[in-house]
Amino acid sequence: MKITQIHTNKPQSLSFEIFPPKKEEDFKNIDEMLEILCDCHPEYISVTFGAGGSSNNNKTIEIAKKIKNQYNVEPVVHLTCLCYNKAEIDEFTRQLSYEGIENILALRGDRNPNVPAKEDFLHASDLIKYIKDTTGDQFCIAGACYPDIHPEAADKVDDIKNLKKKVDAGAELLLSQLFFDNNTFFNFAEDCRLAGINVPVIPGIMPCINAAQIQRMVTMCGAKFPEKFQKIVHRYGDNKAALFDAGM
């Protein structure tokens, strides 16, 4: 089922995002993690995808297959484009189609210093349009959005303008990057509506339970980290159990 239909049927839906393990020996633990997540009855689970040359990309599709076939939950496959050409993207979409996977989160992807960017896709909107043009309505294509503004955007207006390009290219809904202030998201969603972005905007939430992980994600995506959460991390950062209780 396409996730647009899921959100139509059940507007308040739970989903998770997971990262394929980098080490082969950790891959055997994926079932244990999926069983825990699926006990929460998510409507879908998204699986991240590496930049060009990442060995995790085959694992992404393998995990997505497992989510769909073994756990009967809809997978959403992240697909990056900066380090891939059209032929490579065609191969990925063929694999997804063969496995019956209907949902893609189309992303530019982070720059990889070890793999040069290619010329076919410079922006996520380029990838969205290409998938839409080459596959029609076969996939539900989602785009990413940043309530705290994309770190490379000149300002909020520039960010919303680029986001509108994704929707005009064919994105059917938007999945947000993490944020820690609900008002930031509400204001962002209203800005989207005022700009004529009328697709669903789905909030992305990251529990404050791992100090190092939070710092890494905040630095990577430019999210604002409110003082009240900084105090939680400062007070409980050295005690995993206490930070988990306080952060949740």
Predicted regions and their residues:
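Glycine-rich anion/phosphate-binding loops
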Residues: 81-95, 121-123
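N-terminal amphipathic alpha-helix/helix-capping segment at the start of soluble metabolic enzymes
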Residues: 1-16, 23, 132
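Active-site-proximal loop/turn and secondary-structure-junction residues that shape catalytic pockets
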Residues: 18-22, 49-53, 75, 81-83, ...
